[in-house]
Amino acid sequence: MAASLPSTLSFSSAPDEIQHPQIKFSEWKFKLFRVRSFEKAPEEAQKEKDSSEGKPYLEQSPVVPEKPGGQNSILTQRALKLHPKFSKKFHADGKSSDKAVHQARLRHFCRICGNRFKSDGHSRRYPVHGPVDAKTQSLFRKKEKRVTSWPDLIARIFRIDVKADVDSIHPTEFCHDCWSIMHRKFSSSHSQVYFPRKVTVEWHPHTPSCDICFTAHRGLKRKRHQPNVQLSKKLKTVLNHARRDRRKRTQARVSSKEVLKKISNCSKIHLSTKLLAVDFPAHFVKSISCQICEHILADPVETSCKHLFCRICILRCLKVMGSYCPSCRYPCFPTDLESPVKSFLNILNSLMVKCPAQDCNEEVSLEKYNHHVSSHKESKETLVHINKGGRPRQHLLSLTRRAQKHRLRELKIQVKEFADKEEGGDVKAVCLTLFLLALRARNEHRQADELEAIMQGRGSGLQPAVCLAIRVNTFLSCSQYHKMYRTVKAITGRQIFQPLHALRNAEKVLLPGYHPFEWQPPLKNVSSRTDVGIIDGLSGLASSVDEYPVDTIAKRFRYDSALVSALMDMEEDILEGMRSQDLDDYLNGPFTVVVKESCDGMGDVSEKHGSGPAVPEKAVRFSFTVMRITIEHGSQNVKVFEEPKPNSELCCKPLCLMLADESDHETLTAILSPLIAEREAMKSSELTLEMGGIPRTFKFIFRGTGYDEKLVREVEGLEASGSVYICTLCDTTRLEASQNLVFHSITRSHAENLQRYEVWRSNPYHESVEELRDRVKGVSAKPFIETVPSIDALHCDIGNAAEFYKIFQLEIGEVYKHPNASKEERKRWQATLDKHLRKRMNLKPIMRMNGNFARKLMTQETVDAVCELIPSEERHEALRELMDLYLKMKPVWRSSCPAKECPESLCQYSFNSQRFAELLSTKFKYRYEGKITNYFHKTLAHVPEIIERDGSIGAWASEGNESGNKLFRRFRKMNARQSKCYEMEDVLKHHWLYTSKYLQKFMNAHNALKSSGFTMNSKETLGDPLGIEDSLESQDSMEF
């Protein structure tokens, strides 16, 4: 058996004794057990070591150099003698032996091109299914791409799928030539990328007439002939013919260059490289010259194969010769042409060239060459056009319009005749095209590109929507924007920004009242019109002479129209959310939209301007936020949108603005009652709205959670916050809450408050005032807005911080020892605390607690600073433990999703709240004996139940609306008008546009570029994003 096998097959090429599916395992096994007869002699090992050291260094990928055929044949025969059981086995199974021999021979061929590997000892191979080598990895790293294995690259370049290869049919390696093709494809070199085969090589399973095995057998049996003299003569003749053909091809190549030069025909408009002022090296000159006309590059463009040409030359050649690169014949189309990198253009424009004009020896940069030559032409023209005996002939541009018409009369007639004959009378198009060609001929391509953009209707300026985003986000009124527009246009001479009328057209699409919609069933007591924009706040209210007079200015959107506009503004986000959940775009719902409602009063919004009725110097704002959108899919609801920043002013959309006092119950009900009526009607109806070209159905869930305690009591008909019924969630009294600090549950609801109001109004049991008050648990007015029994996280922080501020003062005065302190002493404690906090914590004293002060006050550093003013160590420990417990509990009601953001604090909340209550009733008994604050009660008793019901407290807070209050002040100052009525319209419209997600995307794109370092001044920012608890300012907004 050993004699019958060809001796040219090496040990690694699987001879007879290793005709086994696990060939490599056999090799590894022999090395592992170090069979003595297989071990090489020391001389052989040394020779191999020397030869391997002498070989050139290859990449660190699995490159397999081929060894000469006869090197391991003796080794093979020895192995055959040592392992007779292998030979017996393969004698018995001849078919498997043939397949194994076929598989061994396959290893001598390239998988991609099918060529046989060279047997010179230096042939490099690469495993088809192996990792990418280091050189290729570094190349892709420069290209900012990531590739780890060969199959993806082979499929991308050669369109060959090697992932399904079988070792008995396909070769497992490819050659260095194919590797070079892949490397050149992705490198920036100018070398030609050429694959020698047009058809993919097909590999078939082994058959008796197999091409690979058949050619191998024939190759072994071929005899060598004696050299023939006549044959050598024929060979010489063939070589001569080959030389002659080579010379012809060279001549053809030269002649093709001449043809390309004739096609480009640019010798009169492009500069020769001989005009260069410096004698540069030949390679540099070649790099800055066009590869068609061999002139200096004029308006250079780069092809996808990284060759540089003049724009005119390459476009002419592509038109005449076809869509391929003249240098490397790689497919190339006019749309593939791109401008080279700026650094190359800077080098090109800085080259100094000699002026070819006579009597001018100036050397000018290529960038200023056109201007320099045009000065020569102008001076020449002024010398030519002189009337002898008359006054000098003036230049065309210096003439009056009448004189220009007179001089160009004949040309105008000719142009008009041409336009009527060829272009359907479009004189403007003919003149603009002539101007465009003149600019191109003088290499003034920047102006030509701008003109071409204007001719195509694109314009060189910004889109109206981008200009609107800039105006809204930079807080410019219409008049201020118009001044900026005129100034920029006058200075630059170009219309970069769009005029105001274009912005107003863009506004219409984004404001409520633009999109048609329908309700099924129709909304009760609400008009079916859809083109309703800003309306008066009192519209929809049936007024009579005997009613309470309403002295207010109020502007609002209709609630359903505003919701439609908000949904259409989020159209892209909704459709993208459906795609991300693998849902079809054509699904029409029903979608369920969860809306957070917020309302808040503002004090002191007085202005020193404006006419109209005398209205209160306070304001009330009602707004909403789309929190979540789900779609019914099968038996479950799939979430397609969730607001990532539910407490940002960027998503809190204004619905109603009024100049009124929130404590004025009559005015508040008069303005908000129509709005609430629309809301109640929408609860039992479905909206049909066309989105993405398909009518879709929406249902709405309204959750009134963005109210502070004062306003909750106002709209739910409860007594004021000083009442003995201290909680808006349960019926407990202040005394009961102080005795039982933790164990309470939510019992109040809007429906129950309405029933209790009827009992309060009618007194069916004829009880006394005290008995009746105890029966209705503090309900004293008719509830008119449904709110969700919850806690507002922001006001909870502010209320608790105010209480800690009071505790600090009492601890400084040691009230636990001396409870009966005078007012003067208490004021002195407060002054001492304010002075110390200002010195140590840089906290300036304020008249009223706000979110920013509360955040800074509630820290361990503040407690350490306060402890410096308290002599007792025992009180230090009590204060520190109280603050530590509070800081552990705070994240639970502040975070948007406590189960994800702070699961440990959520689990420990009940324990921490009980310990906190224990401290209040023991160490701080002097303050909390028989009483407790409203927010301490809510914090200790109701937080876990609300989290279990809603999943979050912080996400449903009123921070976005509070931040919107600051925006209201800013918009009002910005949109100052003589009429307060129009002023409120401007504020409402501007605030709505400020919350548009469509406009925010333009600003987010700018911010992304800015953070990447593309802007001029990356250090200059408008401020870090601040939450409402930080400063209640609007600086965390879109930035421009």
Swiss-Prot record:
The lineage of its organism: Eukaryota, Metazoa, Chordata, Craniata, Vertebrata. The keyword Zinc-finger applies. There is a cross-link at K233 (Glycyl lysine isopeptide (Lys-Gly) (interchain with G-Cter in ubiquitin)). The gene is Rag1. Changing Y725A: Deficient in both nicking and hairpin formation. Changing E959Q: Impaired cleavage. Catalytic component of the RAG complex, a multiprotein complex that mediates the DNA cleavage phase during V(D)J recombination. V(D)J recombination assembles a diverse repertoire of immunoglobulin and T-cell receptor genes in developing B and T-lymphocytes through rearrangement of different V (variable), in some cases D (diversity), and J (joining) gene segments. In the RAG complex, RAG1 mediates the DNA-binding to the conserved recombination signal sequences (RSS) and catalyzes the DNA cleavage activities by introducing a double-strand break between the RSS and the adjacent coding segment. InterPro entries: RAG1, RAG1_imp-bd, RAG1_Znf, RAG_nonamer-bd_dom, Znf_C2H2_sf, Znf_C3HC4_RING-type, Znf_RING, Znf_RING/FYVE/PHD. Zn(2+) 2 binds at C290, C293, C310, C313. It is found in: Nucleus. A divalent metal cation binds at D600, D708, E962. Changing W956A: Deficient in both nicking and hairpin formation. SUPFAM superfamilies: beta-beta-alpha zinc fingers, RING/U-box. Changing R713 to A/C: Impaired cleavage (both nicking and hairpin formation). Zn(2+) 4 binds at C355, C360, H372, H376. It comes from the Eukaryota. This is V(D)J recombination-activating protein 1. Residues 39-53 have a biased composition (Basic and acidic residues). It catalyses: S-ubiquitinyl-[E2 ubiquitin-conjugating enzyme]-L-cysteine + [acceptor protein]-L-lysine = [E2 ubiquitin-conjugating enzyme]-L-cysteine + N(6)-ubiquitinyl-[acceptor protein]-L-lysine. Changing D708A: Loss of cleavage and strand transfer activities without affecting allelic exclusion. Transmembrane segments: none annotated. It comes from Mus musculus. Residues 389-456 bind DNA. Its cofactor is Mg(2+); Mn(2+). Changing R401A: Allows robust hairpin activity. Changing R402A: Defects in converting nicked products to hairpins. Changing K973A: Moderately defective with 56% of activity. Its EC number is 3.1.-.-, 2.3.2.27.
